[in-house]
From Swiss-Prot:
Pfam families: Ribosomal_S8 (PF00410). The keyword Secreted does not apply. Keywords: Ribonucleoprotein, Ribosomal protein, RNA-binding, rRNA-binding. The lineage of its organism: Bacteria, Bacillati, Bacillota, Bacilli, Bacillales. GO terms for molecular function: rRNA binding; structural constituent of ribosome. InterPro entries: Ribosomal_uS8, Ribosomal_uS8_CS, Ribosomal_uS8_sf. The keyword Ribosomal protein applies. It comes from the Bacteria. Gene3D superfamilies: 3.30.1370.30, 3.30.1490.10. Belongs to the universal ribosomal protein uS8 family. The gene is rpsH. One of its GO terms (biological process) is translation. It comes from Exiguobacterium sibiricum (strain DSM 17290 / CCUG 55495 / CIP 109462 / JCM 13490 / 255-15). This is Small ribosomal subunit protein uS8. GO terms for cellular component: ribonucleoprotein complex; ribosome. Part of the 30S ribosomal subunit. Contacts proteins S5 and S12.
Length: 132
């Protein structure tokens, strides 16, 4: 089966595993998925991420993070720019998610980064997703 939107698939896998409080999940790896997972780790939304090499494209293993009383760290994920409707924003038009409590992941000419980093570097790009 051909996957038309690998980022939406990644976000859905994370959302589903998070809802049933799984400790980890695995998915087929790609460069953009690895970059998004590293951002989620750096921003404290997931505990860890591993890349497992195999004969094909590799596997990405994501370890989810939960609070002290097992509450979810990720409360929501939303795909913004889709293959059928791309969403682009200039540096000064990149939206803040929940007044700065969440992050927007933006694909720019300087790589994949958070909305805050894109504003600091004054670069716009494709708004991939919101995470809060």
């Amino acid at each position: 089966m051909v996957m038309t939107d690998p980022i939406a698939d990644m976000l859905t896998r994370i959302r589903n595993a998070n809802m049933v409080r799984h400790e980890k999940l695995e998915m087929p790896a790609s460069t953009i998925k690895r970059e998004v997972a590293e951002i989620l780790k750096r921003e404290g939304f997931i505990r860890d991420v591993e890349y497992l090499e195999d004969s094909k494209q590799g596997t990405l293993r994501v370890f989810l993070k939960y609070g002290a009383s097992n509450e979810r760290v990720i409360t929501g994920l939303k795909r913004i720019s889709k293959p059928g409707l791309r969403v682009y924003a200039k540096a000064d038009e990149i939206p803040k998610v929940l007044g700065g409590l969440g992050i927007a992941i933006v694909s720019t000419s300087k790589g994949v980064m958070t909305d805050k980093e894109a504003r600091q570097q004054k670069v716009g790009g494709e708004v991939i997703a919101y995470i809060w």
